[in-house]
Amino acid sequence: MMTVSQLAMLTVVAVASLRSLPAMADYGLASILLYLIPAVVFLVPTALVAAELATGWKGGVYVWVREAFGNRIGFLAIWLQWIQNVVWYPIQIAFIAVSLSYVFGMGGLGNNGVYVAAVIIVLYWASTMVALRGGNLFAKVGSISGLIGTLFPALLLIVFGIIWLAIGKPVQTSLHASALLPPWTGIASIVLIVSNVLAYAGMEVNAVHANDLEHPGRQFPRAIALATALILLVLVLPTLAIAFAVPHRELGLIDGINLAFREFFDHFGMGWGTPVISLLIALGAFASVVAWIAGPSRGLLAAARTGLMPPALQKRNAHDVQEGILIPQGIIVTVLALL
């Protein structure tokens, strides 16, 4: 059985990514609005809908869409959710590979294709092995890894940001009230908000685990509410901390979060902290992979068992886990990593 806090943490790591913080930090105080608008029009409504549907129809996206539009459209919905994640896994694990390169004190290693491919393959199959062991191990690994690899680094950034302001260090972004409004650059501004909407995707992915709660009707809405609050905490305040202290030109597209922490640690004479926090960030990203591996594939199994997919893909192991889907999924990711 899962607990409310475990399911909430799995939802947080499925949605909130520390990787995106440096890019948003470039907008300074305006990042608050750029986070809140998508939260109001997408994150919160999605959370409310997921909580409502999960209390009435267990099984996640496939079951919800099937009940409204029939089996085939339900299958299409879960297929789209599943396939877009299959091609995302190598990207997320490549971020882990970059973080691990800072653990070894070799940041440039993240540009080595052989190293990145090897890390993708090893960690993806490790995630798959965790998922194949069933709900208890999956929930523990995902929630604990998310706690120390996502929440803790986010809170540390907040503390660093507060200290930076308190001791009067130079602030790298404007603190004027006018800076709260993002610059209007036409269609590009709308695209930015839409991209942040996509950054909030995933609130519904763990609805397939609602039945693993002792009292799904009461506990799933609580888990979603807690996850929503934590997601906003993880994204908004740490972004501001980075904006206050780190010039944007010093942040890379992939390793930006690692460079941001290095800036803080070096400034405070704690250079030893960079490899430690990079390891924790890698662990948090690993938790997100674990969460996404177990979610859509379980929903796809529900569709497969209606006869919409071959019997081989309906196979489950002794832990009642969708082995017939996870193994082919791993093969696809391995091929993508080798390209």
Predicted regions and their residues:
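Helix-loop-helix junctions that connect adjacent transmembrane segments
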Residues: 111-115, 144-278
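Transmembrane alpha-helical segments of multi-pass small-molecule transport proteins
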Residues: 5-11, 104-136, 150-158, 326-332
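Transmembrane helix-loop junctions in multi-pass membrane proteins
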Residues: 17-25, 30, 130-136, 309, ...
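Juxtamembrane helix-boundary/capping and inter-helix hinge elements in multi-pass membrane proteins
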Residues: 29-30, 56-59, 67-73, 211-219, ...
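Membrane-interface "cap" regions at the ends of multi-pass membrane proteins
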Residues: 1-51, 55, 174-179, 183
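Hydrophobic alpha-helical transmembrane segments in multi-pass membrane proteins
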Residues: 10, 35, 39, 85, ...
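Hydrophobic transmembrane alpha-helices that form the core helical bundles
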Residues: 25-26, 44-124, 128-132, 282-302
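TM-loop-TM module centered on a large, flexible mid-protein loop between adjacent transmembrane helices
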Residues: 62-65, 70, 102-107, 223-290, ...
